[in-house]
UniProtKB/Swiss-Prot annotation:
Protein's recorded name: Xanthine phosphoribosyltransferase
EC numbers, comma separated: 2.4.2.22
Source species taxonomy: Bacteria, Bacillati, Bacillota, Clostridia, Lachnospirales
Function: Converts the preformed base xanthine, a product of nucleic acid breakdown, to xanthosine 5'-monophosphate (XMP), so it can be reused for RNA or DNA synthesis.
Chain residues that bind 5-phospho-alpha-D-ribose 1-diphosphate: A128, D129, G130, E131, A132
One Gene Ontology CC term in the entry: cytoplasm
SUPFAM superfamilies attached to this UniProt entry: PRTase-like
Subunit-structure text: Homodimer.
Top-rank taxon, per record: Bacteria
């Protein structure tokens, strides 16, 4: 998605060679117009998949996932990273380690919001090592739901996430695929 790539080049900040800071438009300050366009793109790409729910992991995936869910006219389910007083029993849980923070957390899904009849579009802001997506897929498998596709805003293609997810048999559709980045440049994989 050229609009997202352009915004990454304009406002993204590379830290080292593997962290991309996008706090000016995705995960601290959110650009609602960009999120709407992202939601439209995901909705169009997955239009023929019979999606019944969009799922994301809190918190940076919420805005684009909500826009996609709205465009598809389906509910959004948010997988929780933090314990909650309202989510305390009848849960699916799995441990996930974040690439960015290098911390583990219990990813949680309430059993009453996903069923075996659901056809899921999983949306996340980044894909690096594929750990978050793999954890989300584990939870959705526990619920016997079908993962129809995975939508990623920014994929760091020089890391193994896409390969790991593809090896599990899932389609990954990324709006911006970065093949290389450092403090001075960001190179994208151009899709045909």
């Amino acid at each position: 998605m050229k609009e997202l790539q352009d915004r990454i080049l304009k406002d993204g900040q590379v830290i080292g060679t593997n962290i991309l800071k996008v706090n000016k438009f995705i995960n601290h300050q959110v650009d609602p117009v960009l999120m709407e366009h992202i939601g439209e793109d995901f909705a169009n790409h997955f239009a023929d998949k019979g999606i019944t729910k969009v799922v994301t992991i809190e918190s940076s995936g919420i805005a684009p996932a909500l826009m996609a869910a709205a465009k598809m006219n389906v509910p959004l389910v948010i997988l929780k990273k933090q314990p909650s007083k309202t989510l305390h029993n009848d849960l699916y849980q799995t441990q996930v380690t974040s690439f960015t923070t290098e911390k583990s957390y219990e990813l949680t899904l309430s059993r009453d919001v996903i069923s075996e009849d659901d056809n899921i579009l999983l949306i996340d802001d980044f894909m690096a090592d594929g750990e978050a997506a793999t954890g989300a897929i584990r939870l959705l498998r526990m619920a016997h739901a079908t993962v129809a596709g995975i939508g990623i805003l920014i994929e760091k293609s020089f890391q193994p996430g896409r390969r790991k997810i593809n090896e599990q048999g899932y389609e990954v559709y990324s709006l911006a695929r970065i093949k290389y980045m450092d403090e001075y440049q960001i190179d994208f994989i151009e899709e045909n």
